Amino acid sequence: MSGRRWGKSLICQVITCLESMQGKRVAYITPTYLLAKAFFDELALLMPANVAIPNRSDLTFKLITGGSIRFFTGERLDNLRGLKFHYVIIDEASFIPNLEEGWNNAIRPTLTDFQGKAIFLSTPKGKNFFYSLYLKGVDPSPEWESFKFSS
């Protein structure tokens, strides 16, 4: 958790690049399609052209390492059903409606096959599901870690 313009998204975009270059499947979820498209474009600048093949219409990257990156919106979390990932990044999680239901029914099951990991990041917006996840890491629950930075 941190304020605006701190660099959370950039850090997670770098993590996305590194994980996918190791042959892993990564999902990157944003609250809106517009933000997913903007992050796709930013990631296209980070990914070496000889390593990743971008598909702008599907908002995906296929890597020569066997890894992949797929962007999704929080508006349609059911689109993740039936898929599997090593890593899921949920950016601006506080702004995704019905995130708790989406996490339990659509996102979390995608991590089961690979015993994958998820990163939730956001600018705070009240005491919603993102806040309850943040408290799990403060608790500290052994499966959760939380970080807080000022802008």
Task: Give the location of each predicted region.
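Phosphate/NTP-binding elements of NTP-utilizing enzymes
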Residues: 1-151
